[in-house]
């Protein structure tokens, strides 16, 4: 069984016992969180597609940790001017483990 949830402006295909990184959520590590924006729920027999969300379904997950991703370098180079600017960015994320899918 799998589901497609919406979190942080992105859509994620999730299954039970799967861990994934989402955009940073304001939840402490070790707590449980419920995603009610479920776009699709599928098992071996049938598929439920929401318009836009599947009613009465939710995905439960446990927050494992918070962290920051790998550094991305941003370089702005101005030709013939002997000038360049470099910057870096590390995006915050929340790592969650899916515990249940209720359809």
Swiss-Prot record:
Pfam families: Ribosomal_L21p. Disulfide bonds: none annotated. The keyword RNA-binding applies. InterPro entries: bL21-like, bL21-like_sf, Ribosomal_bL21, Ribosomal_bL21_CS. One of its GO terms (biological process) is translation. GO terms for molecular function: rRNA binding; structural constituent of ribosome. The keyword Plastid does not apply. Transmembrane segments: none annotated. GO terms for cellular component: cytoplasm; ribonucleoprotein complex; ribosome. Keywords: Ribonucleoprotein, Ribosomal protein, RNA-binding, rRNA-binding. Coiled coil: none annotated. This protein binds to 23S rRNA in the presence of protein L20. Belongs to the bacterial ribosomal protein bL21 family. Part of the 50S ribosomal subunit. Contacts protein L20. This is Large ribosomal subunit protein bL21. The gene is rplU.
């Amino acid at each position: 069984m799998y589901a497609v949830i919406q979190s942080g402006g992105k859509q994620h295909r999730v299954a039970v016992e799967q861990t994934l990184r989402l955009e940073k959520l304001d939840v402490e590590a070790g707590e449980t969180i419920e995603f009610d924006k479920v776009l699709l729920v599928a098992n071996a027999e049938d598929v439920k597609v929401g318009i836009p969300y599947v009613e009465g379904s939710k995905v439960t997950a446990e927050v494992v940790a918070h962290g920051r991703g790998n550094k991305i370098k941003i370089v702005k180079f101005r030709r013939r001017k002997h000038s360049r600017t470099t910057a870096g960015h590390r995006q915050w994320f929340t790592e969650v483990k899916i515990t249940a899918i209720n359809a």
